[in-house]
């Protein structure tokens, strides 16, 4: 009898603690959205979707497993952000991604990793990074989950490779059209109607200033290689160490915007 009573009490204590912890995590996520510290990722306009249990499991799985060879740099970025620094092995991967010529279309992600590998994160940034890894309310990045799901076999199919090369070579990806292309080619009917509405909304509206850097990066990389000026920018982002948190994205926008933005895009940035 006493043993059963002990088990019952332990169950209620554990259950109550789990619910309290869940409430705290969600409250912290809401605080991130309200306080405006995530303006670079525009969480306020991307909070329409909730992750399914399957997607959440994938997100947690991506942090721990090492078999996702095609997108290991994403996993490494999460790991590097959660610890505040990069290990020697992670640094080797970053250098490998830079030197080998097969990742031309995604070199901007390599630059992001490199820029973060030497920069320091503030305590607030560190809390956000850890929160993004663990919490289940990371609503605005389901498209990344879809992309990872499609590419999680460790290599690209011929069709996926063609898409990547197409995104690099053609210069017609304005706004968020490149995201739509990726989603259309990779999702295979896995997106809900609400998610599709969000994607279309991101393409048509001009209020997503925090993601315009992606457009600029694709435009700058549209020839399959970097110019000397662009290479200098990448090296500068790596060496100067002043990019705390995600400020390097802002710096990249400013550096790439000179002479590369249309009048309409310049107006959007103001």
Curated annotation (Swiss-Prot):
The keyword Cytoplasm does not apply. Expressed by the skin dorsal glands. It is found in: Secreted. Residues 19-35, 52-65, 87-100, 122-135, 157-170, 192-205, 227-240, 262-270 form a propeptide. The modification Asparagine amide is found at residues 83, 153, 188. The keyword Translocase does not apply. One of its GO terms (cellular component) is extracellular region. Residues 1-18 form the signal peptide. The modification Lysine amide is found at residues 118, 223, 258. Maximin-S1 has no antimicrobial activity. Has no hemolytic activity. Maximin-S2 has an activity against mycoplasma but has no activity against common Gram-positive and Gram-negative bacteria nor fungi. Has no hemolytic activity. This is Maximins-S type D. It comes from Bombina maxima.
């Amino acid at each position: 009898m006493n043993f059963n009573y002990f088990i019952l009490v332990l169950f209620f204590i554990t259950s109550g603690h789990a619910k309290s912890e869940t409430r705290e995590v969600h409250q912290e996520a809401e605080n991130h959205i309200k306080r405006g510290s995530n303006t670079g990722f525009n969480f306020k306009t991307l909070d329409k979707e909730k992750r399914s249990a399957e997607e959440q499991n994938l997100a947690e799985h991506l942090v721990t497993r090492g078999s996702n060879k095609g997108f290991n740099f994403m996993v490494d970025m999460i790991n590097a952000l959660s610890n505040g620094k990069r290990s020697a092995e992670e640094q080797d991967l970053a250098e490998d991604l830079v030197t080998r010529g097969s990742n031309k279309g995604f070199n901007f992600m390599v630059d992001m990793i490199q820029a973060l590998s030497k920069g320091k994160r503030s305590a607030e940034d560190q809390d956000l990074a850890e929160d993004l890894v663990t919490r289940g309310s990371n609503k605005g990045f389901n498209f990344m989950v879809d992309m990872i799901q499609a590419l999680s076999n460790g290599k690209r199919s011929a069709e996926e490779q063609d898409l990547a090369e197409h995104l690099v070579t053609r210069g017609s990806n304005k706004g968020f059209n490149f995201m739509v292309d990726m989603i259309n080619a990779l999702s295979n009917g896995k997106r809900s109607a609400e998610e599709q509405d969000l994607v279309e909304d991101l393409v048509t509206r001009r209020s997503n200033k925090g993601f315009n850097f992606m457009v600029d990066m694709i435009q700058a990389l549209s020839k399959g290689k970097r110019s000397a000026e662009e290479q200098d920018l990448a090296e500068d982002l790596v060496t100067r160490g002043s990019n705390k948190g995600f400020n390097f994205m802002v710096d990249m926008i400013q550096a790439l915007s000179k002479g590369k933005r249309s009048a309409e895009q310049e107006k959007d940035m103001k």
